[in-house]
Each structure stands twice: as structure tokens, then as C-alpha cells.
């Protein structure tokens, strides 16, 4: 993390052994002299297992963004850097990342993190690439929708993809629509551009 100078959390060699496989879903625990906490929308610290914004502090933390005082004030509060990433800490202090705060989908009053849905879809070996996002919806506020690229020779249909999700995530997190495309829009670094995905979805509706 650039704003923190280097890493904030890590998994030790022992935590990578077979008996501790569940830890591999986390990004580890804070390194020496660093602290991590999770804050809810009310600014109060969340209980273990409760999702909120990840805030961090440590000796390598930046002083400010160069000549950007307003941007600095938004993220540097009371000696803590607000990452705008969402996640939770378990009872043992391991950090799990749910996704970016700005990417969170609010559908029917429920908070849904695209990364969780994307990870389920990636479990299907016939899906090569996936992007999940919220699309404005008059009834739900936002509708969970997904765009996927299938592997060569796959004949998966959108409905089969939705069916695959059942039992793996809550029903309200299952994409209401799935689009099968030849490719996903990407930026110059090869990262999926969700703004372009959303634009293309709107054009198809």
C-alpha cells in the first residue's frame, strides 16, 4: 500500500501450511508496529466478523498527499489512514478484504460486495473472466448484474451461470442478469474497466 510505505499485513510461513488453509483467504495480521481496525458507517469500531471500512496506522504512514490538502483530509483522520476498502477482522485478528467501498452494491437495502460474487463465478471452470457490478434499478435501487467471458468451446448459458451460484451465496447476491461477451473492456494496464462494463450493459438494455 503506497500510503503506508509498504505492507501492513502479512501471513507467516507457518500460516501457509496445510492445517491452516482457512487463513489463506485472509491477507494476514498486522506486521510489527502497525494497527488495523474496521469502522462502521457510524464511525464506531466493528465487532469481529462485521464488515466495515478498513483503516490502518503505522510508522511508515504518509504525512499527506503532495499539495493536495483536501484529498488528504478525506483519508487521514485522527492519525489513521482510511483505505476505502471494505473488510473484516476475525477473532484472531486476521484481515479479510471484501472489496472497494465505492464498488459496493446496495440492492433492496442489502450491501453486496462484487468481489464475493466474482469469486463464486470464478469457481466455474468454464468462466475465464468476470465483472460484477450494480446497475441502477427503479425497484431495487441497484440490480446485481454480471458480464462474463467463457473459455473456448464453453456453451454455458446465462441461466446456467445463475443456477451455478445457487447454494454458494445468498439469493439476493445472485446476478439478476448475466451477459456473455467475447471480451471485457479493459484499460491500458489490462485491468477490467467497470465504468465501460456498466456503459455496455446499459446499451444492451
Task: Annotate each PLM feature.
Residues 199-205:
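Acidic/polar alpha-helix N-cap and adjacent early helical turns
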